[in-house]
Swiss-Prot record:
GO-annotated cellular components: cytosol
Keyword Methyltransferase: yes
Annotated function: Specifically dimethylates two adjacent adenosines (A1518 and A1519) in the loop of a conserved hairpin near the 3'-end of 16S rRNA in the 30S particle. May play a critical role in biogenesis of 30S subunits.
UniProt-recorded name of the protein: Ribosomal RNA small subunit methyltransferase A
Family from the record: Belongs to the class I-like SAM-binding methyltransferase superfamily. rRNA adenine N(6)-methyltransferase family. RsmA subfamily.
Top-tier EC class: transferase
GO MF: 16S rRNA (adenine(1518)-N(6)/adenine(1519)-N(6))-dimethyltransferase activity; RNA binding
Protein's gene: rsmA
Classification via HAMAP family: 16SrRNA_methyltr_A (MF_00607)
């Protein structure tokens, strides 16, 4: 038995269901139920909550979420080998675990939510983690169908999410993430906690969506950030040229010094430039 429920230890579950991790699916299984419980707790009170979990594998995090009182966990798993293990958990928690065998990069869970907001809590497969996050941050209209995300990434990716201006890791991902959410790196997890052991440290990040981010067109913001960070060592008056407008005038009109570099500009500066770009293009289209 485990320390959080009467189900078998995760190592036994993996052996019994022949769940050897597959590199092609980005799988690394976290087996320490204390760590898994810590991740689940980071999402805040779970009583009455609906939680979306991506890539549950043998179900360690699933069990932690249910043991902490989640009213419903919707587990989206692409690997059919894991379904047997998840069905055993579903039997232990009747009516509280819904298993969806699908590709999380294209599956839309909203029809299962009944209009309620959910939490997303997941040890994301490394190979789809960033695309999934960008998709969740790009949802329209905003605010989104979730109220909290607690996600595990490779440490390098986590640093890129929570970075601020003048940080080495600051870039396009940080601009999008911190425009639409409050982000925080919570804690690291050693490679030794996983089976098989990855070559890198993992980090758990919490993102809480801002109900009313600074107003601007997301696509324009992404274009400005892409241009600016595409030549991050150059001044904005040079790096913003791909936008097809006078870069110095664009930056100056937004209240940003065009001789500065992208890595020194706060998210609010990018938002201001995105709004200005929207106005310029609207005038041009008339």
């Amino acid at each position: 038995m485990s320390g959080i429920d009467d189900l078998p230890p995760l190592r036994d579950v993996i052996k019994r269901h022949d769940l050897s991790a597959r590199k092609s699916l980005g799988q690394n299984f976290l087996l320490d139920l204390n760590l898994l419980t810590r991740i689940a707790r980071a999402a805040g009170p779970l009583d009455g909550a609906t939680v979306i979990e991506i890539g549950p594998g043998p179900g360690g995090l699933t069990r932690a979420l249910l043991a902490l009182g989640a009213a419903k966990v919707i587990a989206i798993e692409r690997d059919e080998r894991a379904l047997g293990a998840l069905q055993e958990i579903a039997a232990h928690y009747p009516g509280r675990l819904e298993i969806v065998c699908a590709d999380a990069t294209i599956y839309d869970p909203r029809p299962l939510l009944g209009g309620a907001r959910a939490k997303i809590v997941a040890n994301l497969p490394y190979n789809i983690a960033t695309p999934l996050l960008i998709g969740w941050l790009s949802i329209e209209p905003w605010p989104p169908w979730y109220d909290t995300m607690v996600l595990m990434f490779q440490r390098e990716v986590a640093e890129r999410i929570v970075a601020r201006e003048d940080d080495e890791a600051y870039g396009r991902l940080a601009v999008l993430a911190n425009w639409r959410a409050e982000t925080k790196l919570l804690f690291d997890i050693s490679p030794a906690a996983f089976v098989p052991q990855p070559k890198v440290t993992s980090s758990v990040v919490r993102l809480v969506p801002r109900e009313t981010p600074e107003p601007c067109d997301r696509r324009m913001l992404e274009q400005v950030a892409a241009a600016a960070f595409g030549q991050r060592r150059k001044m904005l008056r040079q790096s913003l040229k791909p936008l097809g407008v006078d870069p110095a005038r664009l930056a100056a009109a937004a209240g940003v010094d065009p001789t500065r570099r992208a890595e020194t500009i706060a998210v609010s500066g990018f938002v201001a430039m995105a709004r200005e770009l929207t106005d310029i293009r609207a005038i041009k289209s008339v």
